[in-house]
């Protein structure tokens, strides 16, 4: 079961003090400037999923409308989020699962100071799937699959700052897996509701501004029918 926020925050701070980084000198744009970070190996139990991740945002929103709010700190709810992540790209997930099991995590993620995953939900889900089913994989994989390598942000950040970072790394750079149209519409709407301009949204999502306008109009039409 995932730990609470204070426990996670204390553990991540201790990791940065006591452990050697896996990578150094990683530059990311955070809070209006380019900052340099290191990445660390973090035990999976000290992380929680970002339930409104662009890849599964509509599934989570639909579930919460029909049933109840999902709490990533709750084991059953975390399992539901994992299921959404798995089903979102099942074929590709199977292929990546085999790769991670044999070779380990290749790309670092990004997490908040209390362990919320900003970039890397899917990779963390696959690592959790491997560690929760150890008999299916060679024992040589067990050690490296118990940890998620990630940058740990240096401050909590505002909701808007985290949304900006999340969007850039999930939808502006993530060419590994395409997002479905509805996820893009919803992300545009969320950014607009958080006072991002159309120009800012286009840059974050690596799309031309007329496309952003089209998606926002589509989302508005969809909302009018609900």
What are these regions (language model features)?
Residues 84-85, 132, 141-224:
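Amphipathic, charge-rich alpha-helical segments that serve as recognition/docking helices
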